[in-house]
């Protein structure tokens, strides 16, 4: 017999017992009823106390009867307080048990779903699959590296030798340029006409010669 069956007397010849939800609802209704009874008794106690005070000096017999009724009401109130504590404890225990039952039910449902999901899975197959994936990734990386690597189509050159040859060519060109602008004495000048030039022509020629010399000086300074 289940725990709930033992609690509520289910599983016997009387038939199926109440569900936890039904029992919890009944306990809450009982708590509400007892709470109303508490309010009623507290009002009765206050009323009897008022009667006892009112008749304390005038009618002692009535005052004593009121105090006796007050004591009975107080006793009933104490009993209800104890009953409420017991019912509250029982309801909380039942609610916790019901919560645990729902949690376990959902966990079992999830476990079955996980088992179903893993039915067609085998750890060895998973390991093999992961190994295949790793190998394919490595192969893809090797292919990418091979494609991106410069290809000489059978011609392989030493980069250092090529750089040295390029530097030699650059030095030769530089030396050649320096020889061409080594100085004004190496630059052939135009022939001077033997016939006297007009004054204006002589001045223009002199100015042009000075400009040429200035240009040569700038080239020489740049070369150095």
Curated annotation (Swiss-Prot):
Function: Probable core component of the endosomal sorting required for transport complex III (ESCRT-III) which is involved in multivesicular bodies (MVBs) formation and sorting of endosomal cargo proteins into MVBs. MVBs contain intraluminal vesicles (ILVs) that are generated by invagination and scission from the limiting membrane of the endosome and mostly are delivered to lysosomes enabling degradation of membrane proteins, such as stimulated growth factor receptors, lysosomal enzymes and lipids.
Biological process according to GO: cilium assembly; late endosome to vacuole transport via multivesicular body sorting pathway; midbody abscission; mitotic cytokinesis checkpoint signaling; negative regulation of cytokinesis; protein transport; vesicle budding from membrane
InterPro entries, A to Z: Snf7_fam
Stretches with biased composition (Gly residues): 7-17
Taxonomic classification: Eukaryota, Metazoa, Chordata, Craniata, Vertebrata
Protein name: Charged multivesicular body protein 4c
Assembly, per entry: Probable core component of the endosomal sorting required for transport complex III (ESCRT-III). ESCRT-III components are thought to multimerize to form a flat lattice on the perimeter membrane of the endosome.
Membrane topology: Peripheral membrane protein
Protein family: Belongs to the SNF7 family.
Highest rank taxon of the organism: Eukaryota
Source organism of this protein record: Danio rerio
Chain segments annotated as coiled-coil in the UniProt record: 21-221
Record localization: Cytoplasm, Cytosol; Late endosome membrane
One term under GO cellular component: cytosol
Pfam families: Snf7
Record keywords: Coiled coil, Cytoplasm, Endosome, Membrane, Protein transport, Transport
Disordered: annotated span: 1-21, 182-224
Primary localization class, coarse: cytoplasm
